[in-house]
Design a protein with these regions (language model features):
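Short acidic/polar active-site loop segments enriched in Thr and Asp
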Residues: 40-41, 113, 158
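Conserved small/polar residues in nucleotide/adenosyl-binding loops
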Residues: 250-257
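H/E-rich (His + Asp/Glu) clusters that bind or coordinate divalent metals
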Residues: 199-248
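Alpha-helical scaffold elements within enzyme catalytic domains, especially in hydrolases
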Residues: 33-36, 80, 150, 185, ...
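Domain-core and long-helix interface of multi-subunit machines
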Residues: 116-219
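Hydrophobic alpha-helical segments and helix pairs
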Residues: 88-130
Length: 258
């Protein structure tokens, strides 16, 4: 493979593992690919498990019982590769008020390094709705922004993953108002917004959304690139990296180690 190490991101904090049931390849393979691409910092942030009490079994995240083994696996690899790359372990989490305290206890008990917010649902997973589903319902985009702001005000999340996941296709004025509200609050809290490379690489997805990043640029938000890697191939996607870098032209700042 061509050596693209001089033209690729140096740090990534968004990567998944096979435990989420929609990713493949091993953690070791991810790390080896990251080293080959010249990445200096690599964070695993698999989908956080949820403490369901009604017997619901998620098809898109690990179980609570798998979480200790997940962290232990990454910690062993962190020690093994310490002279070649800095490795972190954490979670990507939705802010769901009824699960928040128990998830934070899990986070602390496992000694995780960080957590990023990826607000895939407007509530618990089994209740939905999925924020990436096209909608003209104003209440959904309003609820999305409200949840993100409330969650970020806890101070528990390092950055906001794919902030433009909300697929509102109603009135432009509503979208602009709500996303401006989100961007202003994230700037006030000094929370970086992620330009998502997985969305860029899979052309059928509606994000990264140019209209969102124009708003973020006008507000002056910090931006960070995230691989959102679900397989080794995503770690090698130089084309999507270059396209995502173009989104930075809209923003006035960028987070460290992008």
């Amino acid at each position: 493979m061509k050596d693209n190490r001089m033209d690729f991101l140096k740090a990534n904090y968004h990567a998944h593992t096979w435990r989420c049931q929609h990713a493949c390849d091993t953690e070791r393979e991810y790390i080896e690919a990251a080293i080959a691409m010249g990445i200096e910092i690599f964070g695993f942030s698999d989908h956080v498990p949820c403490p369901y009490t009604d017997g619901y079994v998620s098809g898109i995240r690990m179980t609570m019982q798998q979480a200790p083994e997940y962290v232990e696996t990454i910690r062993k690899l962190e020690a093994e590769y310490q002279d070649q790359i800095k490795i972190y372990v954490g979670f990507e989490a939705e802010y769901v008020p009824e699960f928040y305290e128990e998830q934070m206890r899990l986070f602390r008990n496992l000694g995780c390094d960080y957590m990023i917010m990826g607000q895939h649902f407007l509530g618990s997973e089994q209740m939905g709705p999925y924020t990436g589903t096209e909608t003209e319902d104003e209440s959904r985009i309003r609820t999305y922004v409200d949840l993100v702001i409330e969650g970020m005000q806890t101070g528990s999340y390092a950055y906001l993953a794919h902030p433009d996941l909300m697929n509102y296709q109603g009135m432009d004025s509503v979208y602009d108002w709500e996303m401006t509200r989100l961007c202003k609050e994230m700037k006030e809290l000094d929370i970086p917004l992620e330009i998502n490379m997985l969305g860029m690489g899979e052309g059928a997805r509606h994000y990264p959304a140019e209209r969102f990043w124009k708003i973020a640029g006008e507000v002056g938000n910090k931006a960070i690139l995230g691989l959102d890697a679900h397989c080794v191939r995503h770690i090698q996607d130089v084309d999507s990296y270059r396209k995502c870098m173009d989104c930075l032209l809209y923003t006035s700042d960028a987070a460290d180690d992008r």
